[in-house]
From Swiss-Prot:
Keywords annotated in UniProt: Ribonucleoprotein, Ribosomal protein, RNA-binding, rRNA-binding
UniProt keyword Ribonucleoprotein present: yes
GO BP annotations listed: translation
Organism field: Ectopseudomonas mendocina (strain ymp) (Pseudomonas mendocina)
Record's subunit section: Part of the 50S ribosomal subunit.
Protein name, per record: Large ribosomal subunit protein uL15
UniProt xrefs under Pfam families: Ribosomal_L27A (PF00828)
Region of interest: Disordered: 1-58
Amino acid composition bias (Gly residues), ranges on this chain: 21-31
The protein's role, per its UniProt record: Binds to the 23S rRNA.
PANTHER family (UniProt xref): 50S RIBOSOMAL PROTEIN L15 (PTHR12934), LARGE RIBOSOMAL SUBUNIT PROTEIN UL15M (PTHR12934:SF11)
């Protein structure tokens, strides 16, 4: 016996449905779509959110909020991520280490995790907790 001789037991696999291939298949003529109507036609599906001509929910509700453009050029860095850097940490150093995107113009350090290295942050803002943690580890800030 070879691998190519192996066959499934009779009745183990169901034959796939082939709609519209005669009455003997059980899905002949209308192919399981029923008679007439939108969903019996080809391309008869309706778009998600369509409510039959009634004003859809997303247009009945009022607009609110906006997208801040400032969020596009600002970023946050965790204190634990500063352990990947050495010496003086600048905005360009963070970009080179892929900790912030290339479009970022301002960075703020947040307290999250431990600081194990003494780093000097140049031109980078920090929260009170992050500032205390960095200075406790022997780091300092320059403006």
């Amino acid at each position: 016996m070879q691998l190519n001789d192996l066959r499934s037991a009779p009745g183990a696999r169901r034959e796939k449905h082939r709609p519209g291939r005669g009455i003997g298949s059980g899905l002949g003529k209308t192919g399981g779509r029923g008679h007439k109507g939108q969903t019996s036609r080809s391309g008869g599906s309706i778009a998600p959110g369509f409510e039959g001509g009634q004003q859809p929910l997303h247009r009945r509700l009022p607009k609110f909020g906006f997208v801040s453009l400032k969020a596009m050029d600002r970023a946050e860095v965790r204190t634990s991520e500063l352990n990947k850097l050495e010496g003086v940490v600048t905005l360009q150093a963070l970009k080179d280490a892929n900790l912030v995107g290339q479009h970022v113009q301002r960075v703020k350090v947040m307290l999250s995790g431990e600081v194990t290295r003494a780093v000097t942050l140049k031109g980078i803002a920090a929260t009170k907790g992050a500032r205390a943690a960095i200075e406790a580890a022997g780091g300092k800030f320059e403006d």
